[in-house]
Amino acid sequence: YFLPQRQTKIMNEGWATYWHSKIMTTRALRDDEIIDYADAASGVTAMGPGQLNPYKIGVELYRHIEERWNRGQFGKDWEGCTDLHERLTWDKKLGLGKQKLFEVRRLHNDVTFLDEFFTEDFCRDQKFFTFKENRRTGRLEIEGRSFAKIKAQMLQQLSNFGQPFIFVADANYLNRGELLLGHRHEGGDLKADYARDTLRSLERVWRRPVSLLTILDDKPKRIRF
């Protein structure tokens, strides 16, 4: 029951936000109520550094898709256009946005939704960045604006429902009954304090030392407890 909900969380929350905004601003509210509504809605869609807010990403991506298909910004001609001015003014007035939205809603999950429609234009318009934790201060800092890295980082957060891939490398490490785990590093470092707390709990269950092989700050690292 819960698996389909987890696989479409961004799509579900974005869809609800899209229609809630549409109904409230075009039908339900008086003009003097719009500002209060916008202030409340902005709190729901706020997104801090390194965060993935499903409401924000979902609704903005739906709006992006709607605009693209309304203006005919798809297909070989669009993909092959490299003239910036032509791309900015491109409008075939096709009006296919709503039709495309319902098609996307019917056919996609979060991973395919972002993989297909999270474009470089969308990334630039929404001012996305990649972030990395400064281990000295413990704060997230801007790492760059590479579209490929941004998209990969976002898709990685959706893989395995945002949890790291950990596997058993050796259940009798060094022939001493110790447990050796491996982390499938895909660009994002583990939180070292979380990893140590987890190993501490595993050690209580395993009753022998537990180690984890990972990569921190681009260097191989073995965490042991």
What are these model-derived regions, one by one?
Residues P4, T26, V44-G48:
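Secretory-pathway/luminal and periplasmic proteins that interact with or process carbohydrate-rich
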Residues M11-M24:
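An active-site-proximal "capping" alpha-helix that borders the catalytic cofactor pocket
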Residues I23-Y37:
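Short helix/loop segments within enzyme catalytic domains
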